[in-house]
Curated annotation (Swiss-Prot):
Protein name (database record): Glutamyl-tRNA reductase
Active site (UniProt): 59 (nucleophile)
Transmembrane segments: none
Annotated spans, Disordered: 448-494
Broad class of enzyme this protein falls into: oxidoreductase
Annotated positions for site Important for activity: 108
Species of provenance: Corynebacterium urealyticum (strain ATCC 43042 / DSM 7109)
Binding positions (NADP(+)): 205-210
Assigned EC number: 1.2.1.70
Record's catalysed reaction(s): (S)-4-amino-5-oxopentanoate + tRNA(Glu) + NADP(+) = L-glutamyl-tRNA(Glu) + NADPH + H(+)
Biased composition regions of type Polar residues, renumbered to the chain: 476-486
Residues where substrate binds: 58-61, 118, 123-125, 129
Length: 494
């Protein structure tokens, strides 16, 4: 991919942690700062290295999107701010943080909005969460042009992915497939609205996948669902949703889980925690109470929640991510299609941003030309006091048209070159800016070489002057362009 997205010398800098990088306990501790996100976002802008800020906070991620004009100072300030607001030390945070800069940060937000980075592949809830984060940051006055454009592009990308693919059915398909397998293990011939009548289940976790499991169990006629989670409030919230859907349910903390396991015919775990949630010892104890009645354990987490050794306990069947690969072909096709859409939107956005980056330089060039024209008109007025106002205005209009014509092509070409993000040589860039015919500069050089010392030098002088003048204009313009579109200083070389 050609070029990087910078606004002047600034670029998007993202620092985050999610279910992929951090344990649930750490995520919960960091997420406590979202009680006053506007205050947090303004704290991020207390440092000169950052000019925009947006914080995306969900149950599975906490991401800090900023626009930084200096990479290292900006990164240090973000980490320090997270540590201050969460009450954690840098040493506790840093092993679990990920950092994306410039184009990579842009691509990450597009992936997030598309559900490609979610615990449940393709889930749509993240679109609303990102929109809410944007509105809150906008209200706090911490979002500028760059993050506005990026967020709107991400929301557009997410909508495209969900309307043009069926990736949002991937998570639901996995849960459905897992429960179909569970029915087979339990000797139930087919799925129906009363297939699990008289059976009880435990769902561990309170995120999107746990919610899907609870919903599917209800559709199969489960008698009762117990939702267990580290945070009891969230377990009770998910249980209340099940009750509203007509499924008897209750929420408990993980400390009550061992007792709940004894009554569960089906256990679905989807916490995303780091470390074992259900051990072989837990299941052995439960089976002693159950007198060996068949029990199906479904582990939908990565890394695993349920210890592999539980599969060796008599009367127990363990289904994990590896066991559920039979439904993946369609999902892979949808994921590939979704990533193709993200790639299209990413390239389009980068081109747009690169083109916008050259606008201030183009405006400065045009202003400089108009200032020079004004000075020349003042000089003309002093030199020709007898010229009528009508003639002077005619000259002024003519000169302005000339300046506009001279600047039109390099202005358009500069935007095209910037959008393309290609590296070109000085002669090629000069030819491109002024849209010179291919080979014209070589022809001029050949004529100059053939006439060297021939006595015809004076005849070529006007042509040489025009080329020299164009080169001088180009050098000045190119210097401004590169200063406007290249990261400034050693802190921006990441």
């Amino acid at each position: 991919m050609a070029g990087h997205v910078h606004t002047g010398s600034a670029a998007v800098l993202l620092v985050g942690l999610s279910f992929r990088s951090a344990p649930v306990s750490l995520l919960e501790q960091v997420s406590t700062v979202d009680t006053d996100l506007p205050k947090l976002e303004n704290a991020l802008l207390d440092h000169d290295s950052l000019s925009e800020a947006l914080v995306l906070s969900t149950c599975n991620r906490m991401e800090f999107y900023t626009v930084a004009n200096a990479f290292h100072p900006g990164l240090d300030h973000i980490v320090d701010t997270i540590a201050t607001y969460s009450g954690l030390d840098d040493s506790e945070l840093e092993p679990h943080l990920y950092v994306h800069y410039s184009d990579a940060a842009v691509e990450h937000m597009l992936n997030v909005a598309s559900g490609l980075d979610s615990m449940v592949l393709g889930e749509q809830q993240i679109i609303g969460q990102l929109r809410g984060a944007y509105e809150e940051s906008k209200g706090a006055g911490t979002v500028g042009r760059t993050l506005h454009d990026l967020t709107q592009r991400a929301l557009r990308t997410g909508k495209r992915v969900h309307s043009e693919t069926e990736i949002d059915s991937a998570g639901s398909s996995m849960v459905s497939f897992a429960l179909d397998r569970a029915l087979t293990v339990l000797g139930i011939p087919e799925a129906s609205s009363d297939a699990l009548s008289g059976r009880r289940a435990v769902v561990i976790g309170a995120g999107a996948m746990a919610s899907l499991a609870s919903t599917h169990l209800g559709r199969l006629g489960i008698e009762h669902v117990t939702v267990a989670n580290r945070t009891v409030d969230r377990a009770e919230q998910l249980a209340s949703h099940a009750v509203e859907a007509g499924v008897p349910a209750r929420g408990i903390g993980l400390d009550e889980l061992p007792a709940a396991l004894t009554g569960a015919d089906i256990v679905v775990s989807a916490t995303g925690a780091v470390g074992t949630v259900v051990s072989a010892a837990d299941i052995k104890a439960a089976q002693q109470v159950r007198d060996g009645r068949q029990q199906v354990l479904i582990d939908l987490s990565m890394p695993r929640d349920i210890e592999q050794a539980t599969a060796d306990v008599p009367g127990v069947a363990l289904l994990n991510i590896e066991e559920l690969t039979g439904m993946t072909e369609d999902t892979i096709e949808d994921e590939d299609a979704a990533r193709g859409i993200v790639a299209e939107e990413l390239e389009s956005f980068l081109e747009q941003q690169r083109a916008q980056a050259v606008v201030p330089t183009v405006k400065a060039l045009r202003q400089q030309a108009m200032d020079a024209l004004s000075n020349e008109m003042l000089a003309l007025q002093r030199q020709t006091p007898g010229m009528s106002d009508e003639d002077r205005e005619a000259v002024n209009r003519s000169m302005r048209r000339l300046v506009e014509k001279l600047l039109h092509t390099p202005t358009v070409q500069a935007k095209k070159l910037s959008a393309a993000g290609q590296s070109v040589s000085y002669p090629d860039a000069l030819a491109a800016l002024f849209n010179l015919p291919t080979g014209m500069t070589q022809q001029v050089s050949a004529v100059k070489g053939a006439n060297a010392g021939s006595g015809q030098r004076k005849k070529q002088k006007p042509q040489e002057n025009r080329v020299s003048t164009a080169r001088a204009v180009y050098r000045s313009t190119y210097q401004d362009l590169t200063q406007a579109s290249t990261p400034g200083g050693k802190d921006d070389d990441q």
